[in-house]
């Protein structure tokens, strides 16, 4: 799904996977996930079908955001808990929409222009920022509401994109 902002000062593209993203987490103090599987997903992307992977470490736990293909490749562990919900990742892109281009300062204003209308409708989002782009994850079950809410401010184009 792609959205072009009418007043956002740039282009906002979103990428979603038909199967969505999963959010497994493991308590940091008892994490026994096999590092081999995580290293494969994170660094050996040519050896995996996973196209979206994020690992976040906090003092309390490790959180992994991974697409369905990557989720199936994760090692099993009794210490790994998985969120029941499936999330769709929307990618915020400014300007020409190239994933490899560097983003200008003020990207958060574009992300805010997407998040604010969703918050006004009580639609939950999960924000993930990287150096080059911002991802807004929405619950798969909320997609019709997200589309309806954003269609008043954005032109929505459906597409399948690769990361």
From Swiss-Prot:
> Which parts form a coiled-coil structure per UniProt?
none
Highest taxon of the lineage? Eukaryota
Quote the Pfam families the UniProt record gives: ACT_7, Castor1_N
The family database entries (SUPFAM superfamilies) matched by this protein are listed as: ACT-like
The SS bond pairs are none
Query: Which GO terms fall under biological process for this protein?
Result: cellular response to L-arginine; negative regulation of TORC1 signaling
This protein's GO cellular component annotations are: cytosol
Instruction: Name the InterPro entries on file.
Output: ACT-like_dom_sf, CASTOR1_N, CASTOR_ACT_dom, CASTOR_fam, CASTOR_mTORC1
**Family designation:** Belongs to the GATS family.
The name of this protein is Putative protein CASTOR3P
